Design a protein with these regions (language model features):
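Cleavable N-terminal export/targeting peptides
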Residues: 1-29, 195
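Low-complexity, intrinsically disordered/propeptide-like segments
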Residues: 9, 13, 17-19, 47, ...
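Gram-negative (and chloroplast) outer-membrane scaffold detector with strong preference
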Residues: 23-25, 29-30, 34-43, 59-133, ...
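Predominantly the C-terminal beta-signal and adjacent terminal strand-loop region
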Residues: 80-84, 138, 148, 154-195
Length: 195
């Protein structure tokens, strides 16, 4: 008799949990594309004899696959602008490359969602400097840089959405050649999902 009661209880629990979990396993497989623009800020150590401008205009283009209403896979290209320093030494540091990220979404209502993202990115850090007109520490390196981000999306329609996001790319560059820097990106984007 206890076995019957236990089986009945388990069946009831499964039937109650099914509506809550069905959405997560309900695949939509909807492709999407998007473009964003914003401002990147470089976490640089500015030499005492130089003046640094550590922010610049940045942009991204991306595409991916919405697996279900909660998870999407995204691949893109990011140009994070460049930081400039003038004085002694003077020069630039710029970052660009390929982004590979997993995007999570949680709908507050049909029009508004919160977004979280993380990924493994293949970014190139290029540093070019001069001292008294002579090239100095001109180095470049492409390496893996991890990233995290938070944001929100407002849906104008079933297919078109607007996003506002903050992202941080950690340890861009190589510690032994270019040195490593963190880059923050604040951006707004338009995304189109093929539904």
């Amino acid at each position: 008799m206890k076995t019957i009661y236990l089986a009945a209880a388990m069946a009831s629990a499964l039937s109650l949990s099914t509506p809550a979990t069905a959405g997560f396993f309900d695949l939509t497989l909807a492709p999407f594309i998007g473009a964003s623009a914003g401002q990147a800020s470089y976490d640089l150590s500015c030499p005492a004899t130089s003046t640094c401008d550590d922010s610049d205009t940045a942009w991204k283009i991306y595409g991916g696959l919405e697996v279900n209403e909660y998870i999407a896979m995204e691949v893109g290209y990011a140009d994070l602008g460049e930081a400039k320093f003038s004085g002694t030494p003077s020069g630039t540091a710029e970052v660009n490359g390929m982004t590979v990220q997993l995007v999570g979404s949680f709908a507050i209502n049909p029009s508004f969602s919160l977004i979280g993202r993380g990924g493994m990115n293949f970014l190139n850090l290029e540093k070019n400097g001069t001292i008294a007109g002579t090239p100095h520490n001109n180095e470049g390196d492409t390496d893996v840089a991890w990233s995290l981000g938070l944001g929100a999306q407002y849906n104008l329609s079933k297919s078109v959405g607007l996003r506002a996001e903050w992202e941080r790319y950690f340890k861009v560059g190589d510690e032994d050649t270019t040195g490593e820097i963190d880059v923050d990106l604040i951006s707004a984007s338009v995304v189109y999902t093929f539904r």
